[in-house]
Structure formats: C-alpha cells, structure tokens
C-alpha cells in the first residue's frame, strides 16, 4: 500500500498507474487530460481534483485500466474544480482499458463537469465492460447520467467505500 501526502500534478510518477493499492487524503491533484490514470486501486478522500484548462474541446479526469476484480478509482467527499474550463467540457473519466472502473461518491462537482459524467474511449468497442458509478453528487456538475453510468444507492455506495478503505488505507 502506498500513501501520497500532498497529491500530485498529473500525470506524474505518483499517479496511480502502477497496479498497487494507493490512498490519497486531504490533498490536491491537478492536470488537464487523463491525469489520474492506470491500473491501481486508489481511494481519494476529501481531495480537491483540479482540471486545468487545456483549450481543447474536452478533458478527462480519469483513465482507469484496472483489473476486473479490482475496485478501481474511488472518490469520496472530493471537490472537483477547474481553472477556467468551460461549462460541460470535462468528463469524470473514460476507460483506458475495458475493465477500468471509477466511482464518484458524495462529491461536489463544478459546472465544468459534462452532463454525461463519463465518456467512452473514442476508438474502443468494448467500453461497455468498464464500470462507472456515482452516488450523492452535488453541485452544478451533478446531473442525470446516461444509462451506462451506474447510480448506486446508499447501501451500495457505503459498501464500495468500506471495501476501498479496507484495501487502500495504510494500516
């Protein structure tokens, strides 16, 4: 298990690209495209996730590529903000590999978050194997998502968070 104290400017050497269990708490993570990526199981608790304006039509926060039996990236009580990104131009994630997973639980989402929330990878035909989930989002970027984004009920969200904490939190 790894713990990163101060977050990272991604993509970087501490980005969760290695297939390990990683834990981030009370830190800021910033980048423009796919800045949280890779095959790790990672828990982000009470972090600020900042998207930097790249002046392209769209940006993506996560690009998970984890194992089918893993937890993927789990964000709990995080604040998704931007540095002047236009409204609706930033997606919470897209699957780098078919089994990528991202869950956003009880997070505050700025207006920069696209109404769809998540996006398929442009050239992938197997994006339906990925798992994108959300529960309890608030803020201007919270919206009804497409059918392929799973809406978790409170019990499902609590169970996912419990499992992610057990797997990722340092002892």
What are these regions (language model features)?
Residues 1-171:
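Sequence-level preference for short, compositionally simple segments enriched
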């Amino acid at each position: 298990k790894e713990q990163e104290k101060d977050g990272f400017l991604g993509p970087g050497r501490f980005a969760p690209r290695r297939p390990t269990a990683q834990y981030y708490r009370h830190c800021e993570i910033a980048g423009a495209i796919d800045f949280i990526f890779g095959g790790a199981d990672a828990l982000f608790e009470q972090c600020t996730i900042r998207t930097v304006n790249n002046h392209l039509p769209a940006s993506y926060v996560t690009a998970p590529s984890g194992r089918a039996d893993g937890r993927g990236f789990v964000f709990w009580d995080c604040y998704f903000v931007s540095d002047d990104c236009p409204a609706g131009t930033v997606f919470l994630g897209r699957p780098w590999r078919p089994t990528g997973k991202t869950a956003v639980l009880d997070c505050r989402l700025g207006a920069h978050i696209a109404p769809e929330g998540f996006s398929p990878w442009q050239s992938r035909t197997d994006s339906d194997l990925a798992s994108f989930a959300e529960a309890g989002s608030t803020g201007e970027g919270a919206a009804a998502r497409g059918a392929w984004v799973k809406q978790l009920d409170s019990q499902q969200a609590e169970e996912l968070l419990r499992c992610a904490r057990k797997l990722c939190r340092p002892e």
